[in-house]
Amino acid sequence: MTRTTKKAAAKLNTAIAGAVKRFAPPESLTVDEWADKHRRLSPESSAEAGPWRTKRTPYLEEPMRAFTDPKVHKIVMVAAAQVGKSELELNIIGYIIDQDPGSILYVHPTIDDARKFSRLRVAPMIRDSKPLKAKVHDVKAKDSGNTILQKSFPGGMLTLTGSNSASALASTPARYIIGDERDRWATSAGTEGDPWALAEARQATFYNAKAVEVSTPTIKGNSNIETSFYQGTQERWCHRCPECGEYSEIVFDNIHFDPEAKRIRGKKSWSLKSGVSWSCLLYT
């Protein structure tokens, strides 16, 4: 065999190995297991950059596991601000790209919100997570075909848009729909009507479609995310009491604190005398 033939054979072997790797079956992982293994928090968006650890946010484990349950077709999460709702969405997106690819429609309140989230959260996640970096080409890469609002990967495409964009909501078939901050959405996508209904209509041809809807709630009785929550199983996060061992929901009435008011430079200022404590229903 000549040197030229050996080089050609080596190139062919490399090409075949790459092709075979693409046909490798996905790992048998749930979303939280995938995140613990592959997700890295980026320094731009996290106070603790480095490997993702589900144990730091245990209340996200069940929603992430529900996503890989074939019996579950929609997940609704109602939660306070800054408790990990966006990280839930990002972990699900990463899992889809790497493990169960399909078209994703990721809807934010406005297109500007979508652009900002893509730059500050999605792009760093792809850059810092090896499986995603290998499958999603950088926007700046030559011939990548990707933009800030649209990113292709083997088996699917991630499209980010706003609830006020009727064209994107009405024209993009999608197996997966993810709705961020649902209570801040436009009441109508132009003249086309309810943005969520338009988005869900994009899933009509997918037997294995899944939807994720998250938001901080606004006004009780006039909240889209509240309505969606009450249409589901209405599961709530409960904390185990260190005294009796029973699980109880953490509600404001069971949180105890002793405030005191002081005047500082002529203005009333409130502070806590001795911190904050929580008690379960049996010890309230």
Positions of predicted regions on the chain:
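Phosphate/NTP-binding elements of NTP-utilizing enzymes
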Residues: 1-282
